Amino acid sequence: WLEMARWHCLRTLWLRDQNRPHNAEAAVCKGMVPEICVDVIRDCLVLHGHYGYTQDLPIEQRLRDVCGQLIADGTPQIQKIIIARHLYGREFV
């Protein structure tokens, strides 16, 4: 999942560099990537046990950073509305 998210973000940035429309792709990145990262970080926390929650490892800081990204530029629910409007049109969403 993480590699898929990475490639999707790189493709979105490429579209932006080419001055092509990329609003829906950007919404997918903003809505999908933080959720995937939270899942990956939670797996890391489970793997490391209670030591993963301490400040000795950077995992807890990364979890806080990603949780901030979940609400930055709109929550995942807002991003899903943007994607649906792009796919189905404003009159349906």
Label every PLM stretch briefly.
Residues 1-93:
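Alpha-helical interface subdomain recognition
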